[in-house]
Amino acid sequence: MYEVLDDTAAQIILAIESGDSIRRVAQHLHTPYETVRQAVNRLEDAGYVSYDDGLTVVDERVRDAALEFVAASASISPPSIEEAYVIPQFGDWPFAFARIDAVYVWTQGGYQVGREPNDYPLFLAVRERDVDAWGAFFESFDLPTAFERQPREELNEPLQIVLEPRASLDIEHVEGYPVIPRDETIEYMRENYAQFQSALAMFDRMYEDLDLGVTYRETERAQP
C-alpha cells in the first residue's frame, strides 16, 4: 500500500466523502484538479478507492492507514499554515472556522489581522460533545488545542488550535472551507469594530446584497 500512498494520495483518501467528485475533493484540499485526478487514478488502480457515481474509499482500514501516514508525516515535518487549514477536514466530526478565521474565509483570504507566521492560532467552532475527540485528533498531529489563544512563549511551535465548543453548529461553505454563517461573522466584527472596520468595508464591497454602511480609508503614511 505504501508504494501508492504519498502525502497527496493519503490526503485525498481522508478528504473523500462517499459520492464526491474529483473536483470537489480538489476544492476541499485546495490542490490542482489534475494533481488530484492523477492520484485518484493510482488509488483506483491499486483498489483503494472506487469511482461509481462518485468516489468511495473501499475499506475503512485504508482511511485509518492514510490518517496514520499523514499524522506521522506531520510529526516529522510540522504542518505549514496552509496545511493546517486542511487538516481539520480529515477529522470525523463537523466543524466551522470561527472568529478571525471566519473573517479570513468570508473575505476569501483578503483580510488577515492579529496573527504572524511565527504565532498563528486557528479558530474552530466544534460541537461540545466532540471536544475530546478533536483534542485527541489534533494531538496526533502535534498541534496543541485550548479554548483561548495561548501565549507564544508557552508553545513549542507557531501553530495552535483554539476550539470554541457549541451545543450545535450552523455551517456554510466558502471556497471549500466550512465556516460559521456570514451574519454571525458580521456580528463578531461589529463587536470588535476597531479591529475589523476595514474588513466590514471589504464585506460591503464583496457582497452586493449587503449594505453595512461602513467606509474605511487607510491614512497615508509619511514617506521616510
Language-model-derived ranges and their functions:
Residues 2-8, 54-75:
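Short, cationic-aromatic polyanion-contact patches
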Residues 4-8, 20, 181:
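Alpha-helix N-cap/N′ positions at the starts of helices
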Residues 10-14:
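Hydrophobic residues on short alpha-helical segments
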Residues 16-29:
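Short acidic, hydrophobic short linear motifs in intrinsically disordered regions
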Residues 30-44:
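Short amphipathic alpha-helical interaction segments
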Residues 73-138:
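Active-site nucleotide-donor binding segment shared across nucleotidyl transfer reactions
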Residues 111-224:
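Phosphate-handling catalytic interfaces
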